[in-house]
Amino acid sequence: MGRTPPVADNHGHVNPVKGLGPREVARRFRRTGGWFMGVVALLTWDLDLRPGDLNDVDRLYRLTIESARVIQGEGVRSVAIIGLHPAECVRLIEAGWGLDKVRGYMVKAIDLAAQYIKRGEAVGIGEVGRPHWDVGSDVIKLCNEVIEYALTVAKDLGAVVHLHLERAGEATVKSIVEIMNKVGVRDRGKVILHHASPGMVKPGVENGLTPSVPIGRHGEFEEAIRQSRLIVVESDYIDDPRRPGAVIPPWRILSRVNQLLQLGIVNEDDITSIMVDRIEELYGVKCS
C-alpha cells in the first residue's frame, strides 16, 4: 500500500461559540491528512441565536462563512453551505407560528442565503429538507415546499444543496426526484443527499444525485461502497463538547480510511475518486 490519498469531509459543522471552533478543528484535520471540509450552518440555537429572527439568521450565515474562511486560512480548503435546518420549522410551529408564516420565513432565509452565494461568499444552500423524525403530514408538506423553493433558487445560481431527509431508501430518493423534475433541475449532481443511508445510494446515483455517506456509522460505508463508488463521505461533526462521541470527528476520517484500505474494502483509486475527484467536481476546488 502506497501513500494514503488526502481525505475530505463533505459535510461537517463547527461551533465558534461553544465548541472547539474552526481553527482548532482545521488544525486537527490538517494534521491527519484533511484537505477539504464543507462547513454547513448549525441550528440557530446552537450558537445562542433566536429561531424566527432573520437578523439572527444573518448572524448564523456570517458565522458559518467566517468559519470556512478560518479553516481555509489553516490550509484546509473550505466552502460554506448556508440555510436553515428543518428543525427550525418544527421549533417555530411548536412556538405557535402558523404554517404560512413559517413558510414565508423559510423562503426569506433561502433568499438571504442566495445573496451570499451571489457574492461568492457561500457555495450552497443547506442543510434544508424534512425532519428525519415523525411529524405530521402538514409539516412534511410545508418542508417539501421549502425544498422545492431551495432547489429552484439553487438551480438558478448553479449552487449545491445539502438535503436533510428521513432515511427511507428508495422512497426518500423518489420523493426528491419528483420535486427535482417539477423544478427542472439540470445539474442533478449538485443535489446532495446528506447522511444518506446505504439504501439511498443506488437509487440516488441512478437518478444523478450525490449521496453523502457518514463514514463513522458502523457498517454503513461498507454497504454503501458496494452499491456505488459515485459517492462522497462526511463526518457530520457537530463540534459540541457536551456530545464528544456523537459522531466521528474529521480528524478520525484518515484512520477510518486506513482501516478500510487494510481490510481491502476499498483501494487507493476508490479513495482518490471519493475524497478528491468527486469533491473537486462538486465544489470547483483543487486539491494540491
Residue locations for each model-derived region?
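Divalent metal-dependent hydrolysis catalytic cores, especially in the metallo-beta-lactamase
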Residues: 6-17, 24-59, 73-88, 123-124, ...
